[in-house]
């Protein structure tokens, strides 16, 4: 067992970083326009793969070498998707929520919660929807190197999910928020402090153990120095907590980038990508 216990130390020693979140949209140009003009993101790169009948666009608030970005996927001929009940929201921090909300409104976006203090807290927030119906929480904060600050997913067992992301992915529980009066609990997971980088926000709603996944949200990609060793750790944690490997560690055909992909116990997908291969892709 010494080997397994040594292996389980690896995720904490590894050089991990959130790279991007992948999801599907019905009109790539429409979403690019909305994210650049409304949210102030930059279009970082775009690729069209006609033989596979899809296009990708990468957008973010800084370069992919340092920032967390979105990877939008457009599948030819598919104009809408089912977001499901499990996906929660993305979050963007801004120094002026009201101004950003006005910009959303001016560009035809849907404001679902007007700016105001968060329930039971002091932060000023708002909620808006993009053209595909993905929810974005807008949070008023001071300047930050990473304005794209959260991905929120709902889980059926928060303690199990926290344990999975700690053991399988080497994340830290940055903060736990209990809200019994609103019947939910949140765990903020990440690799760095919450106000400096992206966090994974796991939400447990009392008595809700299952959600629909839909076909819109795809996965989060995280960098690693060794996909093979990381894959072995995932297998050990899968046996203990649930989840499964969906693609064994190894190079992707055509690209050569080494990855391993897996589902967590709630069925959310993560892809670990070799750090050096990822940087090569950006050259």
UniProtKB/Swiss-Prot annotation:
Modification comment: Phosphorylated by SnRK2.8.
Residues modified to N-acetylalanine: 2
Active site: 137
Pathway per the UniProt entry: Secondary metabolite metabolism; methylglyoxal degradation; (R)-lactate from methylglyoxal: step 1/2
EC main group: lyase
Keyword terms of this UniProt record: Acetylation, Dioxygenase, Lyase, Manganese, Metal-binding, Oxidoreductase, Phosphoprotein, Repeat, Zinc
Keyword check for Transcription: no
PROSITE patterns membership: GLYOXALASE_I_1, GLYOXALASE_I_2, VOC
Example GO BP: methylglyoxal catabolic process to D-lactate via S-lactoyl-glutathione
Gene Ontology cellular component terms for the protein in this record: chloroplast envelope; cytosol; extracellular region; peroxisome; plant-type vacuole; secretory vesicle
EC number, as in UniProt: 4.4.1.5
Binding site for a divalent metal cation: 150, 201, 219, 271
UniProt: substrate binding residues: 24, 75, 89, 150, 154, 205, 251-252
Role according to the record: Catalyzes the conversion of hemimercaptal, formed from methylglyoxal and glutathione, to S-lactoylglutathione.
Family membership noted in the UniProt record: Belongs to the glyoxalase I family.
Subunit structure, interactors included: Homodimer.
The name this protein goes by in its record: Lactoylglutathione lyase GLX1
């Amino acid at each position: 067992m010494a080997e397994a216990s040594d292996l389980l130390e690896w995720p904490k020693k590894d050089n991990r970083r959130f790279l991007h979140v992948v999801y599907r949209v019905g009109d790539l140009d429409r979403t690019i326009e909305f994210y650049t003009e409304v949210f102030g993101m930059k279009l970082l790169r775009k690729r069209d793969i006609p033989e596979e009948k899809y296009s990708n666009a990468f957008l973010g608030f800084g370069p992919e070498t340092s920032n967390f970005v979105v990877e939008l996927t457009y599948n030819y001929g598919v104009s809408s998707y089912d977001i499901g009940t499990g996906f929660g929201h993305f979050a963007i921090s801004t120094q002026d929520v009201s101004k950003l909300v006005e910009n959303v409104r001016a560009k035809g976006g849907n404001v679902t919660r007007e700016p105001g203090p968060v329930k039971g807290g002091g932060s000023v927030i708002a909620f808006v929807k993009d053209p595909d119906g993905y929810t974005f929480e807008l949070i008023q904060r001071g300047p930050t190197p990473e304005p794209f600050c959260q991905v929120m997913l709902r889980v059926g067992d928060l303690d199990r999910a926290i344990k999975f992301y700690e053991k399988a992915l080497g994340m830290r529980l940055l903060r736990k928020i209990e809200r019994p009066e609103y019947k939910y609990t949140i765990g903020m997971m990440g690799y760095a402090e919450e106000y400096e980088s992206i966090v994974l926000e796991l939400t447990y709603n009392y008595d809700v153990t299952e959600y629909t996944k839909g076909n819109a949200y795809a996965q989060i990609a995280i960098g690693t120095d060794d996909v093979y060793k990381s894959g072995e750790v995932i297998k050990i944690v899968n046996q203990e907590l649930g989840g499964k490997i969906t693609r064994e560690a190894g190079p992707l055909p055509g690209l050569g980038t080494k990855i391993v992909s897996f589902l967590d116990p709630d069925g959310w997908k993560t892809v670990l990508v070799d750090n050096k291969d990822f940087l090569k892709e950006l050259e």
